[in-house]
Each structure stands twice: as structure tokens, then as C-alpha cells.
Amino acid sequence: MLSSGKFVIYTSRSSGRRKRLKTIGRAVVRVAERLGADIEVYQRKDVLSIFVYYKNGGEEKIPVYCDWGKNWSEEDVYHTIRSVIYTLSFHPDYTILQTIRKR
């Protein structure tokens, strides 16, 4: 199977973010499974909120979700990330993401 890149999640080392990470993580897993993409999670002390990026090959990471000030459900997070990936799939450098357009 051809790799469709990966999602990179940055989260705080604060234990208070674990519940949010689970919610966001489940949403990312749903999108990643549709694309055949990998997921990496990094805990950092210099991160105040949870951030999700998409990375395909090179070093460039595209921000697809920021949880700052949000308490959205898994479904809301999923639709937000999916919407960003859908839009990105029209860019010539990200045609591998076109599978997100199929239902």
C-alpha cells in the first residue's frame, strides 16, 4: 500500500490534557484509516494545547487542527480535520489525499 503521509500530534505533558488527547486522537485515527496514513504523537513541555499536523514526505507540516480554547466532540474534530484534508487534496502536491473525497 502506498503511504499517504502521516499525522503528527503535539500535546502538552500536562496530565489535564489526556482526556482531550483521547478525543482528538480518535478523530485523527478515523481520518488516518481512510487515507492509510500513519500517526505520531509527541509530548512537549513547550506546547500549551493540542496541535495536529499533516506531513507528506518532506519536512513541511501542514496544520490541520488546533484545540486551543475548544472542547469539541470527537465528531466535530473529525469533520474539521477531514474538511482541511479534503481541501488540501485539490492541491497538486497532495493528490494522494484524493481518497478522502470518496464516500
Regions found by a protein language model. Give the residues of each.
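Compositionally biased, charge-rich low-complexity tracts
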Residues: 23-25, 29-30, 34, 86-88, ...
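A generic structural motif
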Residues: 33-41
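Short, intrinsically disordered low-complexity segments
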Residues: 41-62
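Hydrophobic beta-strand residues in large extracellular and virion-surface proteins
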Residues: 7-9, 28, 39, 50-52, ...
